[in-house]
């Protein structure tokens, strides 16, 4: 007997070491573990280190455990073991292995005989075993591995036998053995299990639960023993099931769960491994109802609160698999559904079953690759479905089944289907499939491949390689052209035509043949290779009845379509057995124009109508595939323009509705006049195409004009009226004040006096709506002011009536009254004339010009009645009043103080009281308290003088004194300024169409609030003659009357803006309708009253919103600096470790509104909604920072620094980490941006002035100093305020540093002159002149300068704000001659030289500069303005000749453009002496002829890949390969941390191992790399023929691509799989 030697095993997994995945590796601490365990531990690490499981020592691993040393001593033992010695492992039991081997044959035999799982020696016991009558239980062998469950120490599955007393019967069962602990309520558990047994004992399609036995401190659950599971069956089929298996197993499970629900049992644990197969191959449900019974004792009571950062959920208590757990079963969100303890219900099983079906259909576990916390965030917080669900589409699953699975995954339990309904669905589809032999263990025929043979091959040797269809499908999917040809050739040579036919007709699990797969890939070469054989059927259909031509069209490959048509594909076929759409409809759905051209040229019907009444052209226009629609029209599809669909819309109507000018223009070009006339005037529900085009709203007015112009030229009826309002195109354009469109219609010959159904002409509508531009154009075009509508109103009536709202109409009355035939005496049907309407207006609204125009037409208004307090002025025709001027002037304004007899009145003017006659004055619109006013433009000097304010200053009327003087308050002034009312005018702040907001702090309104709420937003409807406003609000039926001072301007919303509901709005004015604060939508339409129509993704109908409830979302892009808004109480997915002060960098942007933000203290991006964050000012390299005073513990630690430490930012990582240089510190100080505070950047002695961006409202102190004044920083305060001093003011004042900008200080020796346009210097001219020049001799600490002007004795004292530095260069500076300067000798524009001095005329500088250019003996002298600064070259720089230089000035000297040399010397005139290794002598070059070569080092943000010369990086490859593309994220002491889109952690390497590559940018035209077998995240609907453009680039390089003719979300791709498309654009 040979002795056994103990071989140490891995202490983590208890598995013997080997030389493959279990090879022993050593950590830096000396402890060793197997490679597989270390890889799994490293995969959960957030960085490049790994903590030893035994001693907790941290080892630097790099990018992969491959770099760790092997334990060669252990490997020697493994080699010795393979030599024949017997070894044991401390953690294994040989007897168990032997028992398992012994039992395997018996199990196989029993399965082959078809015995029931719990078979017995005799059948007296029935299907359910009475545990009490079978006291003898023996555990035979353990099945599988030990696992843990709930609060139990371990759960073991055993193969066991139970026998009745006296050995009368014996049964084979499966036993779940669980160790009991002291804190378990065993009695309660046994009672619950007994109730479960009784409830389920008569249910079908369930694994029978026989009862529970307590033995040896364990609880044993007895149940039927089965022969595999759905999961094992999937593994046998390479991870997938056939459609038949999905339907059969689905029906079995649905039946079993439905019966359990009827018995009151909720399964709670449905997943493929718990769906077992009995001896007959039927699926049965196991582990039902056990989860709540076997939960942890610590979870018996409901926790009062939940911390989402700790994934200790209900799933932990009941040990549910998170991959299949319904949202309501996660515990913390139970309040969203029910009030019971766990939140589960029978509908929860529907979710689990849906996830299980997803795995059965795709072969992938739902949420595969995500942690439990990530699954919780996705399922409960984001309400997402498993991403694998999307992969079901296109794999041969019936649409009804796919839809049913989607309904199972509804977030709301009430929306999920019942299991009875699902059973009916499965049975209905099973009836359509011929019954095949069961896939049970009894079926002894081995499954050869995963395809269903349509016709059984005649070849008897089905194991031959070429006869296996799976191989053919594999090489087709890989694009292996030679492999396809070889397989088909061997099949033809070996088995003849029948073998080839069987290969080509075979279908994969998705029901597709090899030809379908080749077309789906878009490879014309593969299609040709298959169709070379006569046995190939070009119109073979898949299980859904689709021919290969449909797949080629979906792939967008015109080459494949051409090959199929050449081989006889039927281009006039229809889908769904002839009752569905034609292949042309399929092509128009996908939109590839070249494919459509191939079909139509081959004979496809361009005017075919599908089963929904839509033509091919309808489909193309609806999808906005313009090129495809044009191809249809060019190939006989013009007749489709006359076909109306179910919504009574023709393709022409749809083109107008989608502003598709190109299609309509091409239709007019290719169609006959008869075809155009038949289609152009067909009415839609809203009117003809012309009416629709004229009504196109804002942001598309240009397209609307083009459409109207095209349609009118093509013969559209201009008198056609829309169905709703009875307006023609001209009426609609005039009412919308679209003057360009009105001009287009009039230029087309349409009569300006065209009438609508109400006999209204366009001029009437323009006057009624205040469309002033259109009124002017219509009057110029001959509109008749005398035409009356059905109410008898002409243009005069309408203008006078609307003047109460539209003040411009009073001016239009003056214009219209000039018409020689103006019908001013005509009465309307109500008996009113123009005079009646004007009499109803306040007399002060009627100007003197209008009164004179009316008098000329014989219209006399009643005498004006004056009252005390009325504002008046003298009529302009008064030259000498009856009582004289009495101190007043012709333009004086006053108010009535007393009314005397005989029309005499006492008027209070600023100059005093005056007696005037009533017919000598006219009424004026008064200025009232609170109104905004300013000085009239024609006033040169105010009556009461200036007092600090400027001509542009806007003030507020405080009061009107009894003597007629106004008191006006200005910002910053301590008291009111006296003003003559004749010199002031009201400020016009708003015009029609402006967006305004009612002031939030408004407590009372002059004209009343009504139903209006402060803070509401609206649009100015019109401006009344008294300057008051009518504002349209979305929630009011009529405009609201207000004063301009009661509202404030607000940034308007525009079509296309992305918006969300404000966080301060608890309940929006228009109901939520299922939306939340996190819902993000795009404005698609804006009503006249400001009502927003918003398109929200995944919402079937638009959502309405009041603009005051909404806010714009910043136009974020990757790289923006952001933080959580102050108004956000909690981000969409919780705070986690983020605080309000945290600042991060935008990492990714999803289309659904979610964003990923990189924070320097997190290893993974923080997920939240785009509505949760706002932009902040980013930090920049070079800025000085210190720690914010409120910070006690920085995120990244103090690093031996203090709150007083000041650092200069030297580098910024992509996660926002600030690396700052601190004086006296060797390494950079790493600071979180949320902890840092930016210093002002100013120093004592800096020269500053007010920022121009402050507009007209600087601080009051600075206003007293003067906007253009210059000050000097005297001291810097901690609060951010700077103490300033200036040369003309005593004392100092404080201003915040954000209001200031730094300017260059004047220095001694600089040449200066006076500022252009200066009227007088601060202290007068004092013999100086505006053109004087001088040199600064002294600069004082307060900025005062002393200048020595040429020709003036002594030093001249000056304010630096009055002076300007002369542009001049210092001696030795390198300069370049500017473009446009005339040539001098060999010197021309672009020549580079060196400054040698300046020119003088006598003792004064003449403004010229002397420059030495190489190659010229004389120096160039000319104006300094002809020169610009050039980059100075230095010795040692590498250079080469510019490609634009054909012949260097001093010759090539044996060199070429490719020669690179080093500057060895530079002459005083700039001539370069270049050394090159190839040259025999020094090479002379002109500095203007060369360019420097600088090898730029890698920096953060660069796109990189590993150099081709690197075989193994210093820190190993890990998951990265030589073609991987990443982005430099961080730099640390020569090491680079690179972010790859497929890695969660940063990849570590040396800087020298990488090379810079061109980054992808938004807008790049791209395609999928040739030769790529499978993109990293799958093909989706794309192929190698797909071309598109980049619409998004994440910070880690992940690309979001919009491919041509594809709808929905962008395609996500790895940049290594994508290349630039050089052929596009």
UniProtKB/Swiss-Prot annotation:
GO molecular function annotations of the record: ATP binding; protein kinase activity; protein serine kinase activity; protein serine/threonine kinase activity; ubiquitin-protein transferase activity; zinc ion binding
Native species: Arabidopsis thaliana
Mind telling me which InterPro entries this protein's record contains?
Ankyrin_rpt, Ankyrin_rpt-contain_sf, KEG, Kinase-like_dom_sf, Prot_kinase_dom, SH3_15, Znf-RING_euk, Znf_RING
Which intervals of the chain are annotated as region Disordered?
A: 91-110
Pathway given for this chain reads: Protein modification; protein ubiquitination
Predominant cellular place of this UniProt entry's protein: Golgi
Keyword hit for Nucleotide-binding = yes
Give start and end of each Protein kinase domain: 141-427
Q: Where are the zinc fingers (RING-type)?
A: 10-56
- Which tissues carry this protein? Expressed in all tissues of young seedlings. In flowering plants, only detected in the youngest part of the stem, anthers and the receptacle of immature siliques. Not found in mature leave, older parts of the stem, flower parts other than anthers or mature siliques.
Q: EC number(s) of the enzyme? A: 2.3.2.27, 2.7.11.1
On the tree of life, the source organism's domain of life is: Eukaryota
Which GO BP terms sit in this record? abscisic acid-activated signaling pathway; defense response; developmental growth; endosomal transport; late endosome to vacuole transport; negative regulation of abscisic acid-activated signaling pathway; protein ubiquitination; response to abscisic acid
Q: Where are the ANK repeats?
A: 467-496, 510-540, 544-573, 579-608, 612-641, 647-676, 685-720, 725-754, 758-787, 791-826, 832-863
How it assembles, according to the record, is: Interacts with ABI5 and EDR1.
Identify this protein by name. E3 ubiquitin-protein ligase KEG
Say what happens when this gene is deleted: Plants are seedling lethal and are hypersensitive to glucose and abscisic acid. High accumulation of ABI5.
Protein's job: Mediates E2-dependent protein ubiquitination. Acts as a negative regulator of abscisic acid signaling. Required for ABI5 degradation, by mediating its ubiquitination. Together with EDR1, may regulate endocytic trafficking and/or the formation of signaling complexes on trans-Golgi network (TGN)/ early endosome (EE) vesicles during stress responses.
